[in-house]
Amino acid sequence: MVNIESKAQMLDVQPLITHYMDQLSVRQLLEKYIPKTPQMQVAPADALSMLVFNIINAPNPLYKVSEWAADYLDGIGEKPREAEKYNDDCLGRNLDRLYGCNRDELMIELAANAIHAHHLETDKIHNDS
């Protein structure tokens, strides 16, 4: 007899967010500017991407993100094993890393990716913010 396991996971707008983040190479940029070190349980790119998902989908305070993420990562009604890695301490440390990285270059590359991916007109650009 074959034992089949299944679990229901929440999707919501995650595929759409992932699509646009992939188009802009957000994860690759985060990996480039905030590299993972061996002692980190969660890569900064993963933690910061989780924050982007949360902010767009259902903004929560940092201490509630892992609870929100459980339905997406571990399955609806399941024990939050994967999601508990995205606790407020992990997210806060990675926000500090983002603050400490070369954000100017990261934003310039992100803007260039958006211009390229969406064929935006660049006759006039105001780079004042």
Language-model regions, residue ranges each:
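Dynamic "connector" segments at or just before major functional cores
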Residues: 1-129
